[in-house]
A protein has these predicted regions:
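Extracellular/periplasmic carbohydrate-active domains that bind, remodel
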Residues: 1-132
Length: 132
């Protein structure tokens, strides 16, 4: 996998591996707001044996622990320089959601929002793995 940041209105921001489980229904009138019966949005995902390069960090981001039983194994990641990242900001792309999150500059993999993720043999070189 080799990703890059594209200028303009383009979904994605150079994240080679990215999972998000955030609210996207902000424009729905209150009376039509969907009733959520499950407390889990992403579950039982296993990614194994991926070599990737990207202009942004990898990320797994949920809300209130709604990502569970995710496993990343044997991931080899190289973060490369980007001409376009300053144009869009050092952020993950949560479109069409409205999450505003700046990726730490020294980050290779960010796990947030109470996500339940197991890691095994993850090589991010000098970039940090942040499990917040």
């Amino acid at each position: 996998v080799d990703t890059r940041v594209r200028a303009g209105n383009w979904w994605g921001n150079g994240e080679p591996i990215f999972m998000m489980a955030v609210k996207h229904d902000y424009l729905i009138p209150a009376e039509q707001d969907p009733h959520r019966e499950t407390d889990c949005a992403i579950r039982n995902v296993h990614i194994d044996g991926v070599t990737c390069m990207g202009e942004n960090a990898m990320g797994i981001y949920g809300v209130d622990g709604n990502i569970r039983e995710v496993e990343l194994r044997n991931i080899d990641f190289t973060r490369k320089p980007s001409k376009n990242l300053p144009l869009k900001g050092n952020v993950f792309d949560f479109a069409p959601g409205r999450v505003d999150f700046e990726v730490p500059e020294d980050c290779g993999l960010y796990i947030g929002g109470g996500a339940d993720v197991k890691l095994e043999n993850i090589n991010t070189r000098a970039w940090k793995i942040i499990h917040a």
